[in-house]
Amino acid sequence: MAAPAAPSIARRLLLWASMILILLAILEGASAVFLKSVLPKTARFLLWNPDIAAAHKAWAKVAGNWDDELGWPSPREAVMPPRDATGAKLNPDFPQPGQACASAYGDSFIWGDDIPLKDGWIEQLSRKLGCRVANYGVSGYGTDQAYVRFTRNTQDEAPVVLLGIFPENVIRNVNQFRAFIGFAQSPVWLKGRFVLDGAGKLQWINRPRLDEAGFIHLLRDPASVVPHDYLLPDTRDGPVSLRFPYTLTLARLALMPRLRVRFTGSPTWSDFFRANHPSGALALTAAIAEAFVREAERRGKRALVVMLPDAGSFRVRAELGRPEYAPLLAALAAKHVNVFDPAPALIAALGARSFGARSYCTLYAKPASCNGHFGIAGGGIVADVVMVELRRRGLIK
């Protein structure tokens, strides 16, 4: 009986090609599912996938209700509850504006997200001091917006002013459209920004004046509308555009420097504190903070920059012996800017309370997952530590 004929070379090649195509199709399908369904829920800042229909609805919803330079809050919302007529957060213990012993500017770590309005650490500090501390924090702000808000707020009569810097601000300061870092695609989240000119001086880049068509154009061709935004899609540190082939998109994501940094256990913004980072974020943030302090001095105030570490900052400190924002502390000290890093005192305070391993997690509103903003109990500890520092420096009697 004759042996069966061996498959021809052509048939073998066709078989292998079919298997490879099937594997590629499976890989492409899995990549598409991951990029479209999983990643947007866990790390939306990594992807750029504008929804034009949703953008039209977002435009109609806000109807021009924004600040022409800072983006948010709008002039109307800036003096509406939960803010008072001066733009400060309502303080039930000291509800009457005026005669504040101190004021504070910054982002949600100053405002006090994740907890009741009366329980933010600024409000707890106010109760401990027995005087009004006017809270001008705004969620989502960068150091740049906090500074501009302070320059505008000429009715701030407090003799002492705090500038809170959450480490992620270093990224926000080189960004104009918050949608590039995971915020909703709304015109509200569009802002101006500072750059440093050739002499190292701050120069303000205006917020683009857009109509609805211009806003849609921003989503479709961001570089033509906000060319000074460091985090433009498909740049070194910007989000990756979601497009076919999805496997290639996934590969580009894997090569993102911010993602590689995150895999080391450090916060995604850590690299931005390097002096040689292409964003120039360190020098810019230091210049903005210095400008804030000099403006305070010009107005007869005393200013203190306060770092507001998140849980990731404590992890980096434990592993490396210093936080990721250490270069900013050094840069501000070199500029003779008074800056306070409460982390060592917070660690000591937590140790004295015998919270045990990973005690820094108890500072935050979500201690089980070790994230969020300062919680009620943690905010009380932050307020204690800052109060001691204010008194040590003679800023508060």
Across the structure, where does each feature detected by a protein language model lie?
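N-terminal secretory targeting modules
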Residues: 1-101, 156-159, 170-226
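Histidine-centered active-site loop/cap adjacent to the catalytic His
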Residues: 15, 31, 338, 361-397
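Membrane/wall-proximal cationic-aromatic binding patches
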Residues: 35-128, 132, 147, 237-271, ...
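Generic structural signal for small/hydrophobic residues in well-ordered secondary structure
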Residues: 107, 146, 161, 296, ...
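A conserved hydrophobic secondary-structure block that centers on an alpha-helix together
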Residues: 132-143
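Short, amphipathic alpha-helical "lid/cap" segments that border enzyme active or binding sites
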Residues: 143, 147, 282, 286, ...
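Short, well-structured alpha-helical segments in soluble
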Residues: 148-157
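Serine-dependent acyl-ester chemistry module
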Residues: 167-330, 334-337, 342-353, 364
